[in-house]
Amino acid sequence: MLFDDVPSVGPSEVSAKISDGWTLVDVRTDDEWAMGRIAGSRHIPMDQLVERLDELGDQVVCVCAVGARSARVAQYLNAQGREAVNLDGGIYAWAEAGLPLQT
């Protein structure tokens, strides 16, 4: 797979990362974001990421719908010197695990 080098975490690991001070960034579109999101996530659509990098901390959990866009973002952030991981399976895996979404 193209993103084998990108570290990933499962839905059950995200809360611990947030508790440890990691930023959770949701890179989905505005319409996707409006349908439901993880509480505490910061919405920065993928096409705005470069100009909004200063809104992110040094440790970032990236999320999108299924994990492909967020894997690209995590790969980019890691190349920029940040520590980034991808939520494997994205928001769908989160919801499938029975975890809550905000609307």
Regions found by a protein language model. Give the residues of each.
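Rhodanese-like catalytic fold shared by cysteine-dependent sulfurtransferases
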Residues: 1-23, 29-60, 68-103
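Short, surface-exposed ligand- or partner-binding patches at beta-edge/loop junctions that are enriched
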Residues: 63
